[in-house]
From Swiss-Prot:
Keywords recorded for this protein, A-Z: Cytoplasm, Queuosine biosynthesis, S-adenosyl-L-methionine, Transferase
UniProt catalytic activity: 7-aminomethyl-7-carbaguanosine(34) in tRNA + S-adenosyl-L-methionine = epoxyqueuosine(34) in tRNA + adenine + L-methionine + 2 H(+)
Protein family: Belongs to the QueA family.
Any one cellular-component term (Gene Ontology): cytoplasm
Any single biological process term in GO: tRNA wobble guanine modification
Reported function: Transfers and isomerizes the ribose moiety from AdoMet to the 7-aminomethyl group of 7-deazaguanine (preQ1-tRNA) to give epoxyqueuosine (oQ-tRNA).
Position of the signal peptide: none
GO molecular function terms noted in the UniProt entry: S-adenosylmethionine:tRNA ribosyltransferase-isomerase activity
Organism, as annotated: Shigella boydii serotype 18 (strain CDC 3083-94 / BS512)
Name of the protein described by the UniProt record: S-adenosylmethionine:tRNA ribosyltransferase-isomerase
Length: 356
């Protein structure tokens, strides 16, 4: 399979730079996986699409203000993007600079350069940085960090993004990108879903900056997926098994929930799914056998991204590309602050040939 098979034309004007005034007021394109049929509506239509007893799976990670600006003590501006917090004093990060800092280099971080840190080691493209400060990494980031808006949102972050680029149920700090399908859920909608009898449970996957890395190979099978930490606790496993047992659906909110659930299923020894607390490098593309997820709520993804490949593996390649073509024609808003899709699983997707 070639990366270019997942390309599509997207006018710049369809990239959303701000969210809708109300979280749940975005548009919703529904794709019936088995038939490919499309339905246009609004996000609150989910209420009619979900049945009592269906299980909604959310990712409760919380975005940290992961972008820092500053300079090397020896001169030279730098930009630091946290990939993950290692402990209370250390981070693993991407560093942009005209010349990469060497181990032992002193860094002055923050818009006022008030925070002192040391680059202690390099691991491939990533740098280990230790803060020389009494406060914890999280306190420092909350104090001097900027919200790490994706590269395609071409504007500086604003104070409002600290709330807008965060799900209302976010709980565990550690992500450097929001699980964006969840941004559309507000408290009134969650309340109505609960009242209808829809079950809810949470995984945690701390989205890394690698989620924005382009696929740099021509052939999909050659791509090496970035690693992210995921947690699928026992209560989540119990909720999945109970939903399946009563004939209800497991509905993943976002590709990060999909990757968490399917990672836990891949690692399971004795049951459909078992608790999972580990790094995952799961790469889902056409031909993948889904084991847990029956339906998916997701935003519109970048051309040639691993995420449009994941959706194609779920709904079928042709159905997915047709849906994206329709979304462009109907002027849906794309990417993190854009509109959403509701997709049901296509069991025939695994047999579909792509690019032939």
């Amino acid at each position: 399979m070639r990366v270019t098979d997942f390309s599509f034309e997207l006018p710049e004007s369809l990239i959303a730079h701000y969210p809708m005034p109300e979280r749940s007021s975005c548009r919703l394109l529904s794709l019936d996986g088995p038939t490919g049929a499309l339905t246009h509506g609004t996000f609150t239509d989910l209420l009619d699409k979900l049945n009592p007893g269906d299980l909604l799976v959310f990712n409760n990670t919380r975005v940290i203000p992961a972008r820092l600006f500053g300079r090397k003590a020896s001169g030279g501006k730098i930009e630091v993007l946290v990939e993950r917090m290692l402990d209370d004093k250390r981070i693993l990060a991407h560093i942009r600079a005209s010349k990469a800092p060497k181990p032992g280099a002193e860094l002055l971080l923050g818009d006022d350069e008030s925070i002192n840190a040391t680059m202690t080691a390099r691991h491939g493209a990533l740098f280990e940085v230790e803060f020389n400060d009494d406060r914890s990494v999280l306190d420092i980031l909350n104090s001097i960090g900027h919200m790490p808006l994706p590269p395609y949102i071409d504007r500086p972050d604003e104070d409002a993004d600290r709330e807008l680029y965060q799900t209302v149920y976010s709980e565990k700090p550690g992500a450097v990108a929001a699980p964006t399908a969840g941004l559309h859920f507000d408290e009134p909608l969650l309340e109505k879903l609960r009242a209808k009898g829809v079950e809810m449970a949470f995984v945690t996957l701390h989205v890394g900056a690698g989620t924005f890395q382009p696929v740099r190979v021509d052939t999909i099978e050659d791509h090496i997926m970035h690693s992210e930490y995921a947690e699928v606790p026992q209560d989540m496993v119990d909720a999945v098994l109970a939903a399946k047992a009563r004939g209800n659906r497991v509905i993943a909110v976002g590709t990060t929930s999909v990757r968490s659930l399917e990672s836990a299923a891949q690692a399971a020894k004795n049951d459909l799914i078992e608790p999972f607390f580990d790094d995952t490098q799961i790469f889902i593309y056409p031909g993948f056998q889904y084991k847990v997820v029956d339906a998916l709520v997701t935003n519109f993804h970048l051309p040639e991204s691993t995420l449009i490949m994941l959706v194609s593996a779920f709904a079928g390649y042709q159905h997915t590309m047709n849906a994206y073509k329709a979304a462009v024609e109907e002027k849906y808003r794309f990417f993190s602050y854009g509109d959403a899709m509701f997709i049901t699983y296509n069991p025939q997707a695994i047999n579909e040939r792509v690019g032939e």
